[in-house]
Swiss-Prot record:
HAMAP family, sorted: CobS (MF_00719)
Disulphide bonds in the chain: none
Chief localization: membrane
Keywords: Cell membrane, Cobalamin biosynthesis, Magnesium, Membrane, Transferase, Transmembrane, Transmembrane helix
Protein name: Adenosylcobinamide-GDP ribazoletransferase
Gene Ontology CC terms, in alphabetical order: plasma membrane
Pathway: Cofactor biosynthesis; adenosylcobalamin biosynthesis; adenosylcobalamin from cob(II)yrinate a,c-diamide: step 7/7
Similarity section: Belongs to the CobS family.
Annotated EC: 2.7.8.26
Reaction(s) catalysed by this chain's protein: alpha-ribazole + adenosylcob(III)inamide-GDP = adenosylcob(III)alamin + GMP + H(+); alpha-ribazole 5'-phosphate + adenosylcob(III)inamide-GDP = adenosylcob(III)alamin 5'-phosphate + GMP + H(+)
tRNA-binding in keyword set: no
Species the sequence originates in: Desulforamulus reducens (strain ATCC BAA-1160 / DSM 100696 / MI-1)
Cofactor requirements of the protein: Mg(2+)
Length: 249
């Protein structure tokens, strides 16, 4: 377990906790712990946000919390979001979309997608009470990384030749089940039983989002895993805000 967790942390963050070359089987087993990595990242971000709030900062605290996660992950998922947007919204045929996504240059749609996601996250976080804000910082990365596990284990890989994401395709139902258990436990700890309603909506939105991507690309890639995570994080923060406004969470 701890070996797989260290590998998951090393794979998804800038922390080199796994000091040897992992094979595909080890990478696949580590997928189970992606939501736990999200919990750790979110806890650090929540701590930064709380510290900034304690000295009187509000909007800056929200932004610094988000910047903390981006920094700790090396901007990996934001890069995937931009590449995915450039490819999907290019209006080209399938093979050209995949080529565009591999291009290191960023297009207009990628910039627009990243700006939109960041602005939405900041706006939603700013409207939250401090307690809900801190739970959102923890819950959103957990759910985003669970969504990646769902896509990895249940949907085909889009490219004919393997990329970084293809190394994870040995992951299956066992990894998804454990990742789901971690997510459910975390949600119940943060929200109690009302959190189950939140999870149900998150599961449905995740399914819709993955289906949207697969329909346009023929499968998933490493970039789309990151894009999916970013989109689900944004949805989770919004849903927590909605739950606050209707006094459900």
């Amino acid at each position: 377990m701890f070996s797989s967790l260290r590998l998951a942390i090393s794979f998804l963050t800038i922390f080199p906790f796994y000091n040897k070359m992992a094979d595909n089987k080890e990478l696949a087993q580590s997928v189970s712990y992606y939501p736990l990595v999200g919990f750790l990242l979110g806890s650090i971000a929540a701590g930064v946000c709380y510290a900034m709030h304690s000295i009187g900062l509000n909007l800056a605290a929200d932004v610094l919390g988000l910047v903390t996660i981006i920094t700790l992950t090396g901007g990996l998922h934001q890069d995937g979001l931009m590449d995915t947007a450039d490819g999907i919204f290019s209006g080209r045929e399938l093979h050209r979309k995949l080529e565009i996504m591999k291009d290191s240059r960023v297009g207009a749609m990628g910039v627009i997608a990243l700006a939109t996601v960041l602005l939405l996250k900041i706006a939603f976080l700013f409207e939250l009470d401090l307690a809900q804000k801190l739970t959102a910082f923890i819950m959103a990365p957990m759910a985003g990384r669970w969504a990646m596990v769902l896509a990895i284990t249940r949907y085909p890989y889009a490219r004919a030749t393997g990329g970084l994401g293809a190394c994870l395709k040995q992951a299956g139902k066992t990894q998804l089940a454990l990742a789901t258990l971690i997510l459910v436990a975390g949600c119940l700890w943060l929200f109690g039983l009302p959190g189950l309603a939140l999870l149900g909506i998150v599961f449905f939105i995740t399914w819709l989002t993955v289906e949207f991507i697969v329909k346009r690309l023929g499968g998933m890639t490493g970039d789309t895993y990151g894009a999916l995570g970013e989109m689900i994080e944004t949805w989770v923060i919004f849903l927590i805000l909605l739950g606050q406004q209707i006094r459900m969470l």
